[in-house]
């Protein structure tokens, strides 16, 4: 089963992905994690990626696809994967279709987490990130157990440039312009479920699981209340 957890910046994709990969026992393929690995390693690719992210721009398709295709070639993806934050453009979606088709696979289900823009900005503004593992926190919505330290590895948390309010709005604008058309691509394949992303983490998680269960029972392209 190949799932894609889809939604705007600040919609909670990463939080829900952490649960879903364990629940379904499939690896998570996150472009964010892959990019952070390149940045941490100090590779030329990582330097290029960092420049785009610091400006609030999307990483170009050719760079993203190179990293993703390499990951899909790993043995642990044969049972299926959970795409988190990918694909983000129609070109990426079409390229992913071709890559998966060459492996006799496909994207089986797209979960679209919907959140109002102003709520997204509120969630993103002030968000803190662990530079070591990539886990995110929020002083009010999801605070760490220890002040400004990662719960997982104790690393000091930082505020990324792309999580400042002005950059957050720009990222959302870029998303609306370039990423929403991906939904139309997958709706043509009848694999999309819309999920309300407002409310608590557990509440949203329940809606996502309900959507996946609905797909298994043959329901699709229906809002999940």
Task: Name each region found by the language model.
Residues 1-225:
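Glycine-rich phosphate-binding loop of ATP-dependent small-molecule kinases
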